[in-house]
Amino acid sequence: MNYKSKFKVVEFIVRSEKSSEWESIINLISNYFPYEISEKTENYLRVHVLIYGSEDVKIIQTLAKQIYGKVMPFGHVRTVIIEY
């Protein structure tokens, strides 16, 4: 059966020693997309968002850069896009 992907789930995985930035990172994401926090610890944050188009992918790329700016040089950001 052929079908076209209608939405994508994006997973932001953030590791950092600066957990004080978690709330500002979540606020940044919430300005653009509804989100769900999958895991939040002192050094690790995993957030999922739902996107629908290629314009959203560009926003995700920009968000990843902004999040990295908040956690560098003590952490890193990984973004995974899962198509459905």
Language-model regions: role of each:
Residues 72-84:
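A short amphipathic beta-strand at an alpha->beta junction
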